[in-house]
Amino acid sequence: MEYINLYDVTKCTGCRGCQVACKQWNQLPANIVPFSGGYSTKEDTDAKTFTIIKYFEEEDANGKVTWRFRKHQCLHCGDPACMKVCPREAIFITDFGAVAKDYDKCVGCKYCVAACPFEIPKYDGEIDKVTKCEMCVDRMKVFMEKPDSTDPAKQRDKYNYVPACAKTCVTGSIKFGPKDQLLKEAEARVAFLKANGSPNANIYNPSGVGGVHKVYVLADAPEKYGLPSNPTIPSYINVWQPWIKPYGGILIGLAALGAVGSFFSTRIIKAMRIGEHEGGKTHDA
């Protein structure tokens, strides 16, 4: 059965509890960063920060300020570009839908960094690996092993093992559950928002990447929350898979040429990406 995280921006208070819970569960160190002048603690995720809350401030012609929050992390695409380009097959989709990694196989080539339409994976030079949110696969292993139960106590115990961000959210902004069930809840929520002053409310579950397993309920257009309106798997990946990927793996397997192979292969990806964008094709990244 597929599961998703459903994040409703209209219920989020920007408390950053999910950000802290993610750090704690994954045993990630704190980052000391310079003050950026905004309200976000960080401008973007990094190799040791998998989840952040982004703040967006908009002032209208009358001087009225609108605040928007958004939880920013890997969206766990149904058809992940990162997995398609990985020459070591270190990236895989779990039984419940998360996009996870086998860190023993990862060689830090950064192909996934270049390919992701959301620019999520980040390289960690200290361990020579690329990291990202994995939807707490260790917690989810326990969750999946526990059967559903009509006994409320047993069912609560099962749901103690949902991803840390969902477990800690006090407002109900982040929910975790069966995909079909939560998508129905999302549709009902959007209908409610449209009827109550948010005519542009929508579900962010882009089909261009095969749908996602971190679905958003947005009160306005995706661009208002710093999201691409129509992200797609770049067409160059169709070239990459049959022609370049096999040789990329061979290069990485040769210690003497690994750095060279990674250097040129990632630049091939980036060059194709830029060329596609300049050529006028749809591309949001």
Positions of predicted regions on the chain:
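Non-ligating segments of multi-cofactor redox enzymes
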Residues: 1-285
